[in-house]
Amino acid sequence: MSFAFFFPGQGSQSLGMMNGFAEHALVKNTFDEASAILGQDLWAMINGSDAEIIGQTVNTQPIMLAAGVAVYRAYLEVGGKTPAAVAGHSLGEYTALVAAEALDFADAVKLVRLRAELMQSAVPQGVGAMAAILGLEDEQVRQICAESAQGEVVEAVNFNSPGQVVIAGNAAAVGRTMAAAKEAGAKRALPLPVSVPSHCSLMKPAADKLAEALKTVEIKQPQIRVIHNADVVAYDDAGKIKDALVRQLYSPVRWTETVNALVSDGIAESAECGPGKVLAGLAKRINKAAAGSALTDAGQITAFIEAH
């Protein structure tokens, strides 16, 4: 049976998040590779006691990249089969490209650190915000954003599952949208603890700089189909892949469509490759035919391989 691998983005990090892979030297070695490139000990960070440090986007992005690549390498090391397709949520798209051998891991580490710095500097602290709107239709959320903008930016940026949409933009506009969403019958409107309003048009200046940086990065033809966030399609051409990564910074993550497209293609089963179980849970909520596993420790990897 064909299956897809999903790679998580920011928000799935936690202290001790790789404890389930203590026996896999390859996992720590992968973190050591990334640490050597950045001149920082990422392994010590995730095994320390300061959750705030790993929650800073400049650290979270390389940590989550290393985690996803490490788990994928551990899976292959013990004889796991190649997935039919891969996709990553936001930052996870870079991990997916590494897994598909389109992007060198060392290049990806540098790129995601730069991506984080560009995102952080595009919008000063306190100016932007993000919030999750639960219990409304996608189109309702889009409409409320348009009505609440009042000359500022507020956009629907993550379509995570039916009834779960994340918005981002100027803090005041996000606040107005949250209030209007509650009035419109949203079950909840929750501010997210992030410093950067990802995937909205406030990220365009960062995207322009990312495009410059990508000019010097080699992208090879993917060996596995990579479904891109911005378009919900796969590309073989390096130029198109780079363009998709640039547009991803200021375009919505179309996760609901991604899962549905794979199910329509006969790929209903998926495994989340990295810490956390967010994407595995979303798959089941998006499509009743979808089945999601989470490879959160060595035992889960073994169980998944035995079942496939």
Regions found by a protein language model. Name each.
Residues 251-267:
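A short, acidic, amphipathic alpha-helical segment used as a generic capping/interface helix at domain edges
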Residues 1-140, 192, 269-299:
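FabD-like malonyl-/acyl-CoA
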